[in-house]
């Protein structure tokens, strides 16, 4: 269970870094807004799911 928690936490941290860089870039480039909008929604949904998963796994690990 600890390994799954660590992978989920690493995934959350990496996705957070990607979103911190990607969201301002997506808002700054209006040419690809239609494609960027879908990626932002998917990235945000995955990020929220990972937050809940890490919270749930933290309950079982600690």
Curated annotation (Swiss-Prot):
Domain of life: Bacteria
Official protein name in the record: Photosystem II reaction center protein Z
PANTHER family for this protein: PHOTOSYSTEM II REACTION CENTER PROTEIN Z
One GO CC term, this protein: photosystem II reaction center
Membrane topology, record value: Multi-pass membrane protein
Keywords: Membrane, Photosynthesis, Photosystem II, Reaction center, Thylakoid, Transmembrane, Transmembrane helix
Function: May control the interaction of photosystem II (PSII) cores with the light-harvesting antenna, regulates electron flow through the 2 photosystem reaction centers. PSII is a light-driven water plastoquinone oxidoreductase, using light energy to abstract electrons from H(2)O, generating a proton gradient subsequently used for ATP formation.
A single GO BP: photosystem II stabilization
């Amino acid at each position: 269970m600890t390994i799954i928690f660590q992978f989920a936490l690493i995934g959350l941290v990496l996705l957070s870094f990607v979103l911190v860089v990607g969201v301002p870039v997506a808002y700054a480039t209006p040419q690809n807004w239609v494609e960027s909008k879908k990626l932002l929604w998917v990235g945000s949904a995955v990020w929220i799911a990972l937050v809940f998963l890490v919270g749930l796994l933290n309950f079982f690990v600690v």
